[in-house]
Amino acid sequence: MAKKFDFNQGLIDLEKIVKTMESGDLSLENSLDYFSKGVALTKLCQSALNEAEQKIFMLTEQDNYTNENPLKDL
């Protein structure tokens, strides 16, 4: 069984990748490897956010919650 993606750990890993790449100490090959891992992690994080958004939408729709977003203008 596949392990469930941990969003918070994904963000931590992305931050590490960015810091490592920003250091400028990587070879081109290693930079491409880190970049590839970063893109994959970004997709996983975005997927987790989309899933959470869908769950929130379904929960609020079930309760006949109005679809106003008071935080939208922040």
From Swiss-Prot:
GO biological process: DNA catabolic process
Enzyme Commission (EC) number: 3.1.11.6
Name of the top EC class for this enzyme: hydrolase
Pfam families: Exonuc_VII_S
Coiled-coil annotated spans: none
InterPro entries xrefs: Exonuc_VII_S (IPR003761), Exonuc_VII_ssu_sf (IPR037004)
Xref: SUPFAM superfamilies: XseB-like
Keyword line: Cytoplasm, Exonuclease, Hydrolase, Nuclease
Disulphide bonds in the chain: none
UniProt entry tagged with the keyword Nuclease: yes
Subcellular location: Cytoplasm
Catalyses which reaction(s): Exonucleolytic cleavage in either 5'- to 3'- or 3'- to 5'-direction to yield nucleoside 5'-phosphates
Gene Ontology molecular function: any one: exodeoxyribonuclease VII activity
This protein's GO CC annotations: cytosol; exodeoxyribonuclease VII complex
Top-level taxon of the source organism: Bacteria
Family: Belongs to the XseB family.
Subunit annotation: Heterooligomer composed of large and small subunits.
Role of this protein: Bidirectionally degrades single-stranded DNA into large acid-insoluble oligonucleotides, which are then degraded further into small acid-soluble oligonucleotides.
Protein name: Exodeoxyribonuclease 7 small subunit
Biological source species: Ruthia magnifica subsp. Calyptogena magnifica
Gene coding for it: xseB
